Amino acid sequence: MKKYFGFILLIAILITACIKVPKQFEGLTPGNWRGIFILKDLRQTIITKGKDEVITTDVSTDKKYFTAPFNFSIIQNEKKELVFEVKNADEKIQFYPILFGKDIRTGDDTFYIDLAPYDAHIKGLFDIDQLKGHFIVRDKKNYSIPFEARFGQEFRFEKLPQKATIDINGNWQIVFGKDSNEAFDGIGEFVQNGNQLKGTFRTETGDFRYLEGLVAGDKVKLSCFDGSHVFLFDAMMDGDSLRGIFYSGVHYQVPFVGYRSSNPILQAADTITKIISDKPFEFKFEDSEGNLVSNGDPKYSNKIKIIQITGSWCPNCKDESEFIQSYLQSNPSDELAVFALAFERHKERDKALERIRNYKKHMNINYPVLRAGIANRDSASAIIPQINGIKAYPTMLFLNRKNQIVKVHTGFDGPATSMYESFKKEFANTISELIKSK
């Protein structure tokens, strides 16, 4: 019996020696992941009578939290560096570097994903098939959202959604915060294919960029993560209306209602902000290196000018900057000068300049980006008395050769919207007309 046992043990050792355990990838596992941002904890909390004890009941995983999901991949770039590639409908955004380390207290593996060009990151602990941590926006006080992710999950909201019983393809007239003092109009632009849904919401101050989600039964869900914002739209059909709630991270939510429309309306972007003076708009602000720059400098004399009212924290502003850079590359002109006046969340000069410097470098912006003030509408409005206030970030000012404001474009309809192509044509026509003027 002992000989038999020894023989079996020998065979087991030999078999084990022939098996090669796959080497765990050093870092996050490449491939597809599903991430969630936890907006609310739905676990029931019960106070035990007569005791100072809190008991949290255990519920199924899919009911523990109210979340905003998104999809991403871990890929390698040409330098063999790991990249965090976020997917929202037709857009893919790449963020890097991804840094790794060890928690000195527990020995757990840690990760840190830089979300440049924004002043934000995701950090936490990782295992071969899961991540757990927080999304942190550094230039917003105490802004942190719990984050989790699972490897190999390719669905967004539901793995096996109920068959769609509604069709929301097309355009919808939307009102956010109806009957409140802060109500604002929007247009929903949706493309539905069975359960799959993508689209965006346009407003008079900008769009919500690329949204992706589903239609399940009579319910509609859309989400987006772009490195700066976490958006979730949770709605359902109620008769002929679409009713829901828009969540921006954990700090803002507003109800909305929409009706299908073949001709939805928003105020035209060039009529929202009014020009109230023809006095030349001239300024002098620090650039990212601390040098004073003025549009009144002789080297800019007799040129038409575009002035961006912008901020490094603003995704719509980023879209606008990318458009302007593309236009300048395709249409170089010695008669046009561009300036970006950045209004930053950091109140401290050095921090704001560092933020602008990093943003400009990451975006490869080749025109001056100047520190103009603090990120709010009042701060921006105060430096431009020639108009009746700044209504949105971004806002674009068009100046003639005398530095007079001749047109104001409020907000930005980016590449996720149906209006992007017409905006590009309008922009080109405006520049052409200004260059012709002497």
Locations of regions flagged by a protein language model:
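Structural microenvironment flanking redox-active thiols in thiol-disulfide oxidoreductases
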Residues: 319-364, 375-383
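Thiol-/selenol-based redox modules, centered on thioredoxin-like
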Residues: 392-438
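Bacterial signal peptide processing site
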Residues: 19-21
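Short active-site neighborhood of thiol/selenol oxidoreductases, capturing the structured segment around
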Residues: 293-324, 339
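Central antiparallel beta-sheet cores of small beta-barrel/beta-sandwich binding domains
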Residues: 27, 34-122, 126, 158-159, ...
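N-terminal "domain-start" segment that seeds a small globular fold
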Residues: 261-297
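Structural micro-motif
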Residues: 364-368, 387-397
